[in-house]
């Protein structure tokens, strides 16, 4: 359990959760939790925020209470935003949003935001592994952050994150109709095989990542 301090004259205690396999669970499991067990979903979100305040960043893929960076994206963000938009974060949404904004703007081992913002994507000659997947999934996290910023009336932040949410378009190759790796000069990766399970993607190929590409609309 974690203590959230005094609420009125009573100490507020909530269940604490860890070992968030967020790359695997943010799409379906966590949205389902908000419908079936909303009180637990709220506690999970609180645990993610507490993790950020203790470690500096929202959890990515934790094990035994520690971040191991084995997966990509910052998918605590869509989980928190989904919970907020469903009314499960009522006590301090500004605290939740601050955790999101800092995690998406302060670089850490798994996310080099300076490179991301300089090029508008992750170039494969700088970010050697999973550059396509990292770009697409980061753009989706940015879109979710934009939704919360808009809901909180933070228009400047909304515009910032919506611009980033469009970065996925920079890796769309019109000639092949596929998402495709691009280097820091803007050149497409060659050779290119849409069916290849290459280093450009995480647990899939460019064909897999093109059809359900996270959108900014």
Where are these regions (language model features)?
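Short, small-residue-biased leader/transition segments that mark boundaries at the very start
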Residues: 1-13, 212-216
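Short, charged/polar micro-motifs that form catalytic or ligand-binding hotspots
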Residues: 15-19, 30-35, 66-70, 131-135
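A conserved hydrophobic secondary-structure block that centers on an alpha-helix together
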Residues: 18-19, 38-42, 47, 51, ...
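Active-site cavity-forming subdomains of large catalytic enzyme subunits
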Residues: 47-155, 160-168, 202-204
């Amino acid at each position: 359990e974690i203590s959230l301090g005094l609420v009125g004259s009573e100490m507020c205690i909530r269940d604490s959760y860890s070992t968030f396999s967020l790359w695997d669970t943010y799409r379906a499991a966590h949205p389902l939790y908000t419908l079936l067990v909303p009180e637990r979903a709220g506690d999970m979100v609180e645990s993610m925020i507490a993790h950020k305040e203790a470690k500096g960043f929202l959890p990515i893929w934790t094990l035994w209470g520690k971040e191991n960076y084995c997966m990509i994206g910052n998918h605590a963000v869509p989980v928190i935003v989904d919970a907020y938009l469903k009314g499960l974060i009522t006590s301090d949404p500004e605290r939740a949003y601050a955790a999101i904004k800092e995690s998406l703007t302060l670089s850490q081992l798994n996310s080099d935001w300076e490179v991301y913002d300089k090029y508008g994507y992750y170039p494969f000659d700088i970010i050697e592994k999973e550059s396509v997947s990292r770009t697409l999934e980061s753009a989706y996290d940015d879109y979710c952050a934009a939704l919360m910023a808009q809901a909180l009336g933070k228009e400047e932040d909304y515009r910032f994150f919506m611009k980033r949410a469009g970065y996925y378009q920079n890796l769309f190759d019109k000639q092949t109709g596929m998402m495709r790796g691009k280097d820091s000069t803007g050149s497409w990766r060659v050779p290119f095989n849409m069916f290849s399970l290459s280093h450009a993607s995480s647990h899939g190929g460019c064909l897999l990542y093109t059809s359900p590409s996270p959108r900014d609309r």
